Swiss-Prot record:
The active site is at D155. Residues 25-288 form the Protein kinase domain. This is Putative tyrosine-protein kinase C03B1.5. One of its GO terms (molecular function) is ATP binding. Its EC number is 2.7.10.2. It catalyses: L-tyrosyl-[protein] + ATP = O-phospho-L-tyrosyl-[protein] + ADP + H(+). The keyword Amino-acid biosynthesis does not apply. Belongs to the protein kinase superfamily. Tyr protein kinase family. ATP binds at I31, G32, S33, G34, A35, F36, G37, E38, V39, K62. Keywords: ATP-binding, Kinase, Nucleotide-binding, Transferase, Tyrosine-protein kinase. PANTHER family: SERINE/THREONINE-PROTEIN KINASE TAO (PTHR48015), SERINE_THREONINE-PROTEIN KINASE SULU (PTHR48015:SF16).
Length: 328
């Protein structure tokens, strides 16, 4: 493994200050993986400033390997996530470590640890409208925040919404995020996001903004209630089959749900983003007032985990529960 002070590439130099993670950080367990790389739970034990006691800390470390030609994508992810991180419903991102290796670069992002993981478990279980209202209320708060900053998340799917051990919903993974300035440019050259959650304007290679996230929120709501992607009509579901649904102006049925939920969905379903609700407008929907409490969804989620035999490390004995924000 090579190490250097700076990458030869141009861009955000804070990302490319080449340095490995501190030796006292101990990656303890893999808690996630995918095409991007992997996420490790890290234990950090160090003396406090007075040298009187050991501080125990836990956080997540997202490790990404990529060719150096893609460095601008990682810089965009880090910059947009960092800009948006100061909100209760956005997963906090801290310091970034980077190293070079033969095939390119390895970036290690320090992230807040969300012990209950993503919403896959909730989606695969009996989910009540009040649970989904709680999720939506928290996410809309996060979306108002990032949209006010001129950022669109771009991939509002089940895998990218996390929950902490206290039951707080967190918007995560800004890999598809970008500024309105960039996304509003028409004729984008690529379709980004998760099939089923991608807004029609993105599928049609048009310019888009924060309202694309509201389309994703509507599909996320139905996904949680139905237990699968509501656009899925057969065994195989991919981008091409989703494009067909979009070309036919299809939208999943939601007529068997309560009136407040139907009204909420109606505000998010329009194929024309001009007539689709904004995050701020959606925040006033009656449906959100039917939300369960934080303690209710936390207890429900914990019961589901016990039923499934899931036992990720539980951060109850941690003296410090924070994310490093500077290189050490």
């Amino acid at each position: 493994m090579q190490s250097a002070q700076k990458s030869k590439t141009n861009g955000d130099t804070s990302l490319f200050l080449m340095k490995d993670i501190p030796q006292y950080w101990s990656p303890a367990l893999k808690i996630g993986s995918g095409a991007f790389g992997e996420v490790m739970l890290v234990h950090s034990d160090r003396l406090d400033a007075r040298g009187e006691q050991i501080l125990h800390n836990e956080f997540a470390l997202k490790v990404i390997r990529f060719p150096e030609c893609d460095y601008h994508k990682i810089i965009r992810e880090v910059n947009t996530h960092t800009l948006c991180r100061h909100h209760d419903n956005v997963l906090f991102i801290g310091s970034i470590y980077c190293q070079t290796f033969q095939q390119g670069l390895r970036v290690q992002m320090c992230l807040e640890y969300a012990a209950l993981s993503d919403l896959s478990l909730l989606a695969s279980s009996e989910t009540f409208e009040s649970h989904v209202a709680y999720i939506c209320k928290n996410l809309i708060s996060a979306l108002i925040h990032i949209h006010n900053l001129g950022i669109v998340h771009g991939d509002l799917s089940v895998k990218n919404i996390l929950m902490t051990h206290e039951g707080v919903v967190k918007l995560s993974d800004f890999g598809m995020a970008n500024t309105f300035e960039q996304t509003r440019k028409s004729k984008n050259q690529s379709i980004l996001g998760t099939p089923g959650f991608i807004a029609p304007e993105i599928i049609n290679l048009q310019g888009y903004d924060g309202k694309a996230d509201l389309w994703g929120l509507g599909i996320l709501s139905l996904f949680l209630l139905k237990g699968e992607n509501p656009f899925k009509k057969c065994t195989q579901f991919d981008l091409e089959s989703y494009k067909v649904s979009i070309s036919e102006s299809f939208y999943p049925d939601y007529s068997n749900y309560s009136t407040p939920l139907q009204e909420f969905m109606s505000s998010l379903k329009d194929y024309n983003p001009e007539f689709r609700s904004s995050a701020l407008h959606a925040s006033s929907q009656t449906y959100l007032k039917t939300s369960c409490s934080q303690s209710e969804i936390l207890n429900y989620y914990k019961r589901l985990r016990r039923t499934r035999g899931m036992d990720l490390p539980w951060p109850e004995e941690i003296h410090t529960f924070s994310v490093p924000v500077s290189l050490e």
